[in-house]
Amino acid sequence: MAPIAGKKAKRGILERLNAGEVVIGDGGFVFALEKRGYVKAGPWTPEAAVEHPEAVRQLHREFLRAGSNVMQTFTFYASEDKLENRGNYVAEKISGQKVNEAACDIARQVADEGDALVAGGVSQTPSYLSCKSETEVKKIFHQQLEVFMKKNVDFLIAEYFEHVEEAVWAVEALKTSGKPIAATMCIGPEGDLHGVSPGECAVRLVKAGAAIVGVNCHFDPSTSLQTIKLMKEGLEAARLKAYLMSHALAYHTPDCGKQGFIDLPEFPFGLEPRVATRWDIQKYAREAYNLGVRYIGGCCGFEPYHIRAIAEELAPERGFLPPASEKHGSWGSGLDMHTKPWIRARARKEYWQNLRIASGRPYNPSMSKPDAWGVTKGAAELMQQKEATTEQQLRALFEKQKFKSAQ
């Protein structure tokens, strides 16, 4: 598509990465918008793009102002089968096409307010969990891809996949577009839920057509970077090249198992004590950069101030600060304007780097025991349905939870 008159054409994602630039992604839309009252926890579907476009637009703008130069379409779980899963019935009121189109329009509008690109995103499907065929699952990805092509997104992202098999199917479907593809999996160092190692996952994704690979969601920054290191080693051993991408959680989850934070008993409504500080995220950004990751952002829990922390930490490499830094002194330097002297004494990097942060919850444990049900594709509990979950189905799950807790 020709550039708008008077505006310089934007460089694409691979042009930026080829030039050695750091690309900063956005943060966690479904969690942020759930807290604001626009997304329903449980289905986590993005119909807010149609129902409350101003809320989605504002969050995009806040991420742009914080330093993001990719506006990812709010199309997480926007496949037709997810929009009508377990009694959600969104697709009966608002078609998947309308949700995807609205999300693309909003992302493009905000991206064009700055030097940001638009990425059209697909994610794992209920159909795959229910053992549908490769052809059926790819058809779902192609439905979203048709919208992304019509709206001329700049590149594509296949994100949030627990099984590399489905991620490969997504990449293969998206590859027909001819646009650059990034692929991220929600896995930890143990690999995907079928036991495929991170290194092998990366190799399969690159061979399928992904130019950028990495992880998103499910694990904290530290664990996510451990996984990316294994992916990097796998690619090097196979003599394959790809750019690395990390969209970690903004929660500390050292106690989670193979399923990540969704296995923690606090998920999703009790995670606030685990939120990473802006200083934690600066450390994450530096460690990611040192590992060779050049596409850095966040997923669930990541708010605009977390993205600003990435942009500030990597400002020396990028050569500029984001607009949101105008109201943020580096390492708390703005506290020198505070009325209280003991707060002014905190206006220094050493204070915040060395502070051991208390939770304020003296009777609570610092770690939790993951549920670890161990179910994956093919398990009866993971077979999806259009109808709402029945009371009988819920009672069976409650009983299983009691049994697991007693073990």
Curated annotation (Swiss-Prot):
Cellular compartments annotated: Cytoplasm, Cytosol; Nucleus
Positions carrying Phosphoserine: 330
Molecular function terms from GO: betaine-homocysteine S-methyltransferase activity; identical protein binding; methyltransferase activity; protein-containing complex binding; zinc ion binding
Consequence recorded when altering residue 159 to G/K: Loss of catalytic activity
Cofactor-binding details, from the entry: Binds 1 zinc ion per subunit.
Positions contributing to Zn(2+) binding: 217, 299-300
Subunit structure: Homotetramer.
The protein's name in its UniProt record: Betaine--homocysteine S-methyltransferase 1
Record organism: Rattus norvegicus
Native organism taxonomy: Eukaryota, Metazoa, Chordata, Craniata, Vertebrata
